Amino acid sequence: MLLCDIGNSNANFLDDNKYFTLNIDQFLEFKNEQKIFYINVNEHLKEHLKNQKNFINLEPYFLFDTIYQGLGIDRIAACYTIEDGVVVDAGSAITIDIISNSIHLGGFILPGIANYKKIYSHISPRLKSEFNTQVSLDAFPQKTMDALSYGVFKGIYLLIKDAAQNKKLYFTGGDGQFLANYFDHAIYDKLLIFRGMKKIIKENPNLLY
């Protein structure tokens, strides 16, 4: 079974248990004869995907209990296997969604870590810097690189901590593993979105035929 999660920068694939990533240009050249079950948040690719006969869009099959307007299919898929907890998908944006008794209570969005860097560099050339991923969140910074890093990482940490209360935390996405390290009982699951997609196919076995 070949699954594909298409974002704005990359398309991530799971081929049985083999995970691989293509950038969007590579994805447009990608050819495969078997059925490809996908979700897509990239508006520019919608027409292209409609013309690919072996690409099956899973989005219409997700029945998700939420009153959130315009919730992205990637966020729905990431939350779909979680009954209780907070789901953090840390990519080009960081999305935080709160689930209780399989009901989506709401969520919020932050810039991704790489985009914080861009924001700082736009403010001033003096704020163009790499982040110190080892910066302590328990001591006030004494140099610019640490000050920028502290502002980003502590801000993200406190918002997630406040949303989580005592709920389990589930992290996914490119920076998910890094952010999960700030929390004692966090679970990092690189394949969380794919688990949601697999659950949909299991609920709709006719899709396989």
Curated annotation (Swiss-Prot):
Write down the InterPro entries for this protein, in alphabetical order.
Answer: ATPase_NBD (IPR043129), Type_III_PanK (IPR004619)
Recorded GO terms, molecular function? ATP binding; metal ion binding; pantothenate kinase activity
Record-listed ATP binding positions: 5-12, 92
Record field: catalytic activity: (R)-pantothenate + ATP = (R)-4'-phosphopantothenate + ADP + H(+)
Subcellular localization is given as: Cytoplasm
Q: Which positions in this protein are listed as binding substrate?
A: 68, 72-75, 144
| Co-factor note (free text) | A monovalent cation. Ammonium or potassium.
- Binding locations of K(+): 89
Top-level taxon of the source organism: Bacteria
Active site (catalytic residues): 74 (proton acceptor)
Q: State the UniProt keywords alphabetically.
A: ATP-binding, Coenzyme A biosynthesis, Cytoplasm, Kinase, Metal-binding, Nucleotide-binding, Potassium, Transferase
> Where does the UniProt entry say this protein principally localizes?
cytoplasm
Listed Pfam families: Pan_kinase
GO BP terms: coenzyme A biosynthetic process
Q: In which pathway does it act?
A: Cofactor biosynthesis; coenzyme A biosynthesis; CoA from (R)-pantothenate: step 1/5
Give the enzyme's main class according to its UniProt record, as a single word.
transferase
Assigned GO CC terms: cytoplasm
Q: What is its EC number?
A: 2.7.1.33
Q: Which cofactor does it need?
A: NH4(+); K(+)
NCBIfam families named in the record: baf (TIGR00671), PRK13333.1 (NF009872)
Function comment: Catalyzes the phosphorylation of pantothenate (Pan), the first step in CoA biosynthesis.
- Self-association and partners: Homodimer.
The entry assigns this protein to a family as follows: Belongs to the type III pantothenate kinase family.
What the entry lists under HAMAP family is as follows: Pantothen_kinase_3
**Name of the protein in its database record:** Type III pantothenate kinase
In its UniProt entry, the species of origin is given as Campylobacter jejuni subsp. jejuni serotype O:2 (strain ATCC 700819 / NCTC 11168)
- Chain's gene name: coaX
